[in-house]
Amino acid sequence: MAGDRAVQHNLEAAWPADLPAGDERRLLAAGRALLRADATGAGRAKWPSVFGDPHRALAPAFATARFRIQAAIARRDKSPDTAVVHLVWAGMDRGGTFTDLRVTDWFFTRTSKKGAATWTAQPRT
């Protein structure tokens, strides 16, 4: 979508890249998966520390067929070991209202285990 490219361009222009490319790719993939799980319910079981018990989860608010991520960036947050994935998305809720330019931020912390760094999503508070 042409409008989505403009949103992506504006995000990148407003918030210059400050993470290594590999970290940015991993964070973007995780952020997109988290947003899809949060909005549609699909894949929540993969994130128990974020969504809790999948058997007690709330019904998803958005239909998977009417959900799309318009733009996304991953950037450092307050320290080198924290990051935020900023996502702009569109979706139709269960009531049939379609809205675009919704904004969601997911926060991550970096930990090292056996010399390998991993990014862990933080639950919302």
What do these predicted regions represent?
Residues 39-125:
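Structured, amphipathic secondary-structure segments that form assembly/contact surfaces
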Residues 1-65:
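Core segments of small alpha/beta cavity-forming domains
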